[in-house]
Amino acid sequence: MNAVDLIVEDDAWSSLAGKTRLVEEAISAACKELPDRTPGVVAILLGGDEGVASMNAQFRGKAGATNVLSFPAGEHADNHLGDIALAHGVIQREAEDRDIALADHLRHLIIHGFLHLQGFDHQQDDEAEVMEAIERRALARLGVADPYPNEDPGPGPHSE
């Protein structure tokens, strides 16, 4: 499994019990779906909308907060795979809008961010299908419902 460095920057996350375990289990589930993954330490920032909005503007040139940002460390990072930043307010609103638990939505977005650190993307439909299939399998390992219930699961790499 990849090691996790969890940083809780926003007090809004204090109401979520078992954060460390949740984060580690999400990364572990993703790792089980990626036998050829790149090892290394993943830093996960549980932040607020304002901080993530600032990063989104600075690094992507986009205004406003987004749910998750991934920052791959690159080739010369000595065991640091990259960083994942998550915005509490955005994630909370999305979970409420979708009528799902905050913890389950967070698990999904951690797995999603980790896949970006592993080189996966979803710019093209075929890439999105592969990425979503891995997300579905990793979440199923955690007992989390399919986050894409109205979409065809599409093909994906098999872990067994």
Swiss-Prot record:
The reply on keyword Cytoplasm is yes
Instruction: Give the enzyme class.
Output: hydrolase
| Binding sites annotated in the UniProt record for Zn(2+) | H112, H116, H122
PROSITE patterns hit by this protein? UPF0054 (PS01306)
Name the Enzyme Commission number(s) assigned to this protein.
3.1.-.-
Please indicate if the UniProt record lists Transport as a keyword: no
For this UniProt entry, the molecular function terms from Gene Ontology, in alphabetical order, are:
metalloendopeptidase activity; RNA endonuclease activity; zinc ion binding
This protein is called what?
Answer: Endoribonuclease YbeY
